[in-house]
Amino acid sequence: MSEAKPKAKVRAPKINFETKAFWDATAQGKLNVGKCDDCGEHYYYPRPLCPFCFSDKTRLAECSGNGVIYTYSVTMGKEPYTIAYVTLAEGPTILTNIVECDFAKLAIGQKVKLVFYDTGEGSAVPMFTVA
């Protein structure tokens, strides 16, 4: 996964006991999703109980960083940006930003890949760009 250069400062996430492993992984350039060892489903956001079968036999699983745009919206303003739902190759759909692209050429179903924005505070925020 690559590190992107933001136009505007990306705020560091508030990290707590439940989210620490997730954010530690992003600082290393990895995006983890939850995976259930009982039913095999991947899910996002990672949490201790599987949202599909309610098993507590869950773990973090690194995802490929590949996905497709499910839907998106471009917000035009002083600093235009795109917010989108991206469906990961592993199955979960996540809310994220699409960066470093021509907003006018985005399309639902378009392939995207993971990039990280360094917050400058020891963490990185996962976002996507056109593949």
Regions of interest found by a model, annotated:
Residues 1-31, 130-131:
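A broadly conserved sequence feature marking short terminus-proximal activation segments
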Residues 118-131:
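OB-fold/S1-family single-stranded nucleic acid-binding modules
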Residues 92-103:
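Beta-strand/loop nucleic-acid-binding surfaces
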Residues 101-113:
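Short nucleic-acid-contacting surface segments enriched for D/E, G, S/T with interspersed K/R
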Residues 37-40, 54:
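Cys/His-coordinated zinc-binding microdomains
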Residues 67-69, 98:
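Conserved hydrophobic positions within beta-strands
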Residues 30-33, 47:
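Residues immediately within or flanking Cys/His clusters that coordinate Zn2+
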Residues 72-78, 117-119:
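Short, conserved beta-turn/loop elements at beta-strand boundaries and strand-helix junctions
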